[in-house]
């Protein structure tokens, strides 16, 4: 009898409790394993001093000595090796002739777009920090990386955070300290966001990390010629704000040079590989925004991962806060979702990268920022 009463009470109480429905709707049906990459590594074997060009005629590498090279290029690129008739290059970083590998190619910028609302999914306009990225890797005559230059073309800020930082990191397993010194082309004050030792126009990697973190900026806003507005180059109703391009030179320790074949870019950490990551910092040092599978630094605020129920800088339905195009493309206007501005972005993501890397065509110009031009392909 008591058992029947308890069962009856349980039924009555249960009928009074309303379990909230999960109202979350995934905007895109993205395969869980999709890495959001438009780039890949292609292995090239050089047997004599050579240049490398892609199918468009863009220069990927110049004056490479014999060796194996893992070149980061747009997916499905066709690469050609052309014998060089020039003399071997000088070894000084900044010299006019260099043995160099370029990303995405010589004299051209890829486009990096960050969303600042991590760990929330955000408004998906991907314009909170936008910049052109070009990296030059300098090698010695044994095909080892000895230095690299990170070229930045600031383009837009759609973030309300007054302080935004950019940084790179270089790491491998087991941990190794690679960097000898860093120098900046401008008088940027980097240690308002990053803890560095600075002297004589050079500065150190950020102190207190398990691997080398290379500050690229102090406040990213300092490179925009407009100190009064928060939103810069993200609304067509606003006047164009010009920006200052700059670069950061990174020289490696003589005993830490590594074979170019070991280099990866924006890839997960892996034994035997040396990866270079690019990430953003929004508001405070702990709020880092990385590409999917990026490695957080010691200053990252790890409770953010509790909010996302993931630890790889992607949501449970595999949305991300960092996107890269290998081309110089226009970014969405404020509050315009990237997959509305670029209709093929949706099919590209939902197919797990199918159809190649050209999701930026066609474009809906009404949804894109068009009040200025940073040598866009569209």
Predicted regions and their residues:
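Bacterial Sec-dependent N-terminal signal peptides
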Residues: 13-34
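Sec-dependent signal peptide recognition
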Residues: 1-8
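A eukaryote-biased signal for long
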Residues: 208-378
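Short, well-ordered beta-strand segments enriched in hydrophobic/aromatic residues
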Residues: 133, 145-156
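Short Pro-Gly-centered beta-turn/loop motif in secreted/extracellular proteins
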Residues: 64-98
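Structural beta-strand segments of beta-rich domains
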Residues: 40-42, 146-150, 246
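Short, ordered, surface-exposed loop/turn motifs in non-cytosolic proteins
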Residues: 39-64, 126, 162-164
């Amino acid at each position: 009898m008591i058992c029947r009463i308890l069962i009856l009470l349980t039924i009555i109480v249960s009928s009074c409790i309303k379990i909230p429905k999960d109202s979350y709707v995934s905007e895109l049906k993205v395969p869980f394993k999709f890495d959001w990459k438009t780039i890949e590594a292609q292995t090239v074997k050089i047997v004599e001093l050579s240049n490398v060009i892609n199918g468009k005629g863009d220069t990927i590498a110049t004056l490479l000595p014999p060796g194996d090279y893992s070149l980061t290029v747009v997916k499905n690129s066709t690469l050609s090796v052309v014998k060089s008739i020039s003399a071997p290059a000088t070894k000084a970083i900044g010299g006019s002739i260099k043995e160099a590998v370029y990303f995405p190619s010589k004299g051209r910028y890829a486009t990096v777009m960050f969303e600042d609302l991590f760990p929330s999914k955000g408004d998906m306009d991907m314009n909170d920090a936008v910049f052109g990225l070009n990296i030059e890797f300098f090698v010695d005559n044994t095909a080892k990386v000895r230095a690299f230059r990170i070229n930045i073309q600031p383009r837009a800020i759609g973030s309300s955070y007054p302080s935004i930082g950019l940084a790179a990191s270089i790491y491998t397993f087991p941990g190794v300290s690679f960097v000898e010194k860093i120098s900046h082309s401008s008088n940027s004050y980097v240690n308002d966001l990053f803890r560095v030792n600075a002297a004589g126009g050079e500065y150190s990697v950020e102190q207190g990390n398990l691997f080398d973190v290379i500050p690229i900026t102090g406040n990213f806003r300092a490179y925009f010629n407009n100190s009064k507005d928060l939103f810069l180059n993200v609304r067509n109703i606003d006047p164009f704000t010009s920006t200052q391009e700059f670069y950061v030179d990174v020289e490696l320790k003589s005993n830490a040079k590594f074979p170019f074949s070991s280099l990866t870019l924006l890839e997960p950490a892996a034994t035997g590989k040396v990866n270079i990551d690019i990430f953003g910092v929004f508001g405070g040092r702990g709020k880092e925004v990385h590409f999917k599978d990026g490695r957080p630094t010691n200053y990252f605020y790890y409770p953010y991962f509790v909010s996302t129920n993931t630890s790889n800088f992607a949501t449970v339905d595999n949305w991300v806060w960092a996107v890269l195009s290998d081309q110089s493309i226009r970014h969405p206007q404020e509050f315009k979702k990237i997959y509305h501005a670029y209709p093929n972005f949706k099919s590209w993501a939902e197919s797990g990268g199918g159809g190649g890397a050209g999701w930026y065509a066609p474009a809906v110009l009404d949804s894109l920022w068009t009040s200025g031009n940073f040598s866009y392909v569209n």
